[in-house]
Amino acid sequence: SYHLDESGYTCRAWIFDISGRRISEVVNHDLLGIEGELAWNGLAVNGSKVRTGVYIFYAELVHPQGKIERYKEVFLVK
């Protein structure tokens, strides 16, 4: 889940494997509210379920006034 100080941010977010290959796109230029949740369905771009392993969530939030926020989180899929 997330909480932003102000509205107006758009978000792009991806899932990468531990080798740095992009596995999935979570959102693409979606307008975010001040609070919310970004959820990934556990599927790769081709629609198949990903294997057990370590993955990286990476998001870029861009505000119309030029602010850019970047977030990265490592997680395990079992």
Model-based region annotation:
Residues 1-14, 65:
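Glycine-centered coil/turn sites that cap beta-strands in beta-rich domains
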Residues 3-5, 27, 78:
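A structural detector for beta-sheet-dominated domains
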Residues 14, 24, 72-74:
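Small/flexible residues
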Residues 15-23, 55:
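Short, glycine-anchored, charge-dense loop/turn motifs used at functional sites
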Residues 1, 52-78:
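C-terminal tail/sorting-segment detector
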Residues 8, 22-50, 61-68:
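Glycine-centered tight-turn motifs at strand-turn-strand junctions
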